[in-house]
């Protein structure tokens, strides 16, 4: 089918219009799901979401009824780097900027322009390669990956083909406890540098699609895994671990909703015990890790059903789109093979030659990574549930470590962060680095409870104020007169008064209704405004209630 393209036409910038390049809508190539996924208007930048756990299906739902088959899953992950400028030109990139406002002749593919490699891209690639336990190539090169699409202005993408910058690595992770837990090790085939394409903007109300080339030339690192995963949960956790790693390294914000981290999943099935792979199907359009889990589980079920119905020949090598509304995958296009891309060396860029000193300097600057942090926390005696919560977010891990540096008990600090502080972060939808509480004051709060200066109940009230308003533990205690009453005589006097004021309850208690001790304790705490030492209170109260 012939398609007419209006090349190079650009609309004036005005209210109600979009300065994108116009192309006839490519109906045969694009599905209705793609069209719905993109807005025809520029999207405003969004703040990074607060830390949260991956919402996956239950363990029982994740266990596929494979009926003698096993899934083979590999993932290609594209990580958009947080560099100041693009990969091969000096244009900046800002998510949500006005379409076609951060472009130049180089990233728009004008004739006669030449690429110049951004050194920061190489540094990020080496960092990620080391973090993934890869072999770093001392010499690598760029290649042209050629295909036609309106968002690819040069008609080819600068990538790496046969000599990537890193290869033969692995990633370690721990599955959540609710899914059975356990350690997993997944192989990494390669990490290579490349540039991003532009972005097609579709509108169902128009017969044209627009092209925004702001993203064209933005540096990417593609991470290709070995086909080592067997379930949707494993694949989702693999993607989440890569996100944690790039955030720990600072090479990318890893935000899936901005396209900074994109996962394309390859799924096939085969009879258990068979060494040969089945027909591989690629799945795209998954914008969360829970969507990755659900898309894979659906695709496994679809392929098993076709095998059971004698229609295995209908499983073809293709690209399918995940549709969130129907919870199904749909055919997008036939999958290209390597020969279709006609790779050949990029003649306008020299080889990338590294030295041992350069790699060693980068290695020395590497931060502690998620896997090392998990093992350190585990050796401190924390449960795996605590370990995963604290280590899975770099900001939370840093806050926790800083609290320990100020002398806080490891388990008590973990309990406070995972309890009241985590609840506040969830309710207010903020990150831990946005609250006014400091690690020093959390350690002071824990110490004040431990040494009896304040009670745990008062501690919770102080914590809430410190989180919202800031300040110091000592200052709040003095300002509100919250020092715990630990004088036995003072507590005994309050106990005597409460017992005297409640003769009926005293009679019921001594008749066998011993649960009423909680009533008396509550009345004393009320009289003391929550400041009575609870251990001392219960001791004195028990003696008084049981006295003859």
Swiss-Prot record:
Question: Which InterPro entries does the record associate with it?
Answer: Asn/Gln-tRNA_amidoTrfase_suB/E, Asn/Gln-tRNA_Trfase_suB/E_cat, Asn/Gln_amidotransferase, Asn/Gln_tRNA_amidoTrase-B-like, GatB, GatB_C_1, GatB_Yqey_C_2, Gln-tRNA_amidoTrfase_suB_CS
Record localization: Mitochondrion; Plastid, Chloroplast
Write out the GO MF terms. ATP binding; glutaminyl-tRNA synthase (glutamine-hydrolyzing) activity
GO biological process per UniProt: glutaminyl-tRNAGln biosynthesis via transamidation; mitochondrial translation
Q: Describe the family membership recorded for this protein in Swiss-Prot or TrEMBL.
A: Belongs to the GatB/GatE family. GatB subfamily.
Q: What does this protein do?
A: Allows the formation of correctly charged Gln-tRNA(Gln) through the transamidation of misacylated Glu-tRNA(Gln) in chloroplasts and mitochondria. The reaction takes place in the presence of glutamine and ATP through an activated gamma-phospho-Glu-tRNA(Gln).
The entry's protein name is Glutamyl-tRNA(Gln) amidotransferase subunit B, chloroplastic/mitochondrial
Q: What is the originating organism of this protein?
A: Sorghum bicolor (Sorghum)
Q: Which gene encodes it?
A: GATB
């Amino acid at each position: 089918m012939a398609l007419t393209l209006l090349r190079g036409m650009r609309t004036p910038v005005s209210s109600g219009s979009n300065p994108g390049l116009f192309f006839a809508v490519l109906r045969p190539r694009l599905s209705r799901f793609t069209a719905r996924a993109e807005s025809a208007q520029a999207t405003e930048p969004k703040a990074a979401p607060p830390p949260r756990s991956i919402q996956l299906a239950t363990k029982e739902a994740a266990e596929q009824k494979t009926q003698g088959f096993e899934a083979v899953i590999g993932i290609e992950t594209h990580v958009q780097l947080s560099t100041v400028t693009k990969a091969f030109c000096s244009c900046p990139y800002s998510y949500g900027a006005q379409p076609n406002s951060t472009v130049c002749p180089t990233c728009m593919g004008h004739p006669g322009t030449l690429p110049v490699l951004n050194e920061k891209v190489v540094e990020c690639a080496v960092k990620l390669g080391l973090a993934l336990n890869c072999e770093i190539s001392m010499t690598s090169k760029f290649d042209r990956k050629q295909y036609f699409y309106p968002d690819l202005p040069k008609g080819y993408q600068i990538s790496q083909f046969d000599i990537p910058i890193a290869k033969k690595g692995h990633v370690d992770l721990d599955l959540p406890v609710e899914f059975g837990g356990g350690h997993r090790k997944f192989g990494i085939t390669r990490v290579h540098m490349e540039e991003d394409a532009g972005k097609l903007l579709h509108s169902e109300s128009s017969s044209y699609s627009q092209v925004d080339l702001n993203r064209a030339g933005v540096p990417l690192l593609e991470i290709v895994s070995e086909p080592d995963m067997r379930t949707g949960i494993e694949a989702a956790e693999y993607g989440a671990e890569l996100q944690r790693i790039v955030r720990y390294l600072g090479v990318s914000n890893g935000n899936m909703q901005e396209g900074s981290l994109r996962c394309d999943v390859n799924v096939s099935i085969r009879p258990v015990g068979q060494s040969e792979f089945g027909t591989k199907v690629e799945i795209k359009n998954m914008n969360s890790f829970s969507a990755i889990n659900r898309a894979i589980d659906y695709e496994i079920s679809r392929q098993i059903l076709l095998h059971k119905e004698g229609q295995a020949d209908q499983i073809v090598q293709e690209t399918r789109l995940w549709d969130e509304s129907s919870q199904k995958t749909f055919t997008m296009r036939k999958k290209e093979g390597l020969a279709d891309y006609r790779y050949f060396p990029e003649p306008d860029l020299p080889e990338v030659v590294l030295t041992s000193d350069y790699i060693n300097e980068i290695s020395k600057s590497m931060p502690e990574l998620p896997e090392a942090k998990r093992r350190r926390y585990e050796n401190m005696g924390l449960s795996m549930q605590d370990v995963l919560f604290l280590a899975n977010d770099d900001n939370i891990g840093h806050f926790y470590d800083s609290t320990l540096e100020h002398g806080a008990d490891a388990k008590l600090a973990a309990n406070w962060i995972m309890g009241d502080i985590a609840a506040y972060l969830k309710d207010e939808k903020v990150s831990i680095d946005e609250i006014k509480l400091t690690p020093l004051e959390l350690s002071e709060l824990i110490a004040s409870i431990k040494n009896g200066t304040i009670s745990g109940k008062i501690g919770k009230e102080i914590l809430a104020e410190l989180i919202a308003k800031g300040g110091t533990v000592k200052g709040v205690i003095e300002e509100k007169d919250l020092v715990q009453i630990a004088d036995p005589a003072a507590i005994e006097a309050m106990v005597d008064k409460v017992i005297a004021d409640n003769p009926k309850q005293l009679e019921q208690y001594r008749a066998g209704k011993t649960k009423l001790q909680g009533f008396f304790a509550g009345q004393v705490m009320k009289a003391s405004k929550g400041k009575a030492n609870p251990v001392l209170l219960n001791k004195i109260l028990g003696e008084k209630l049981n006295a003859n």
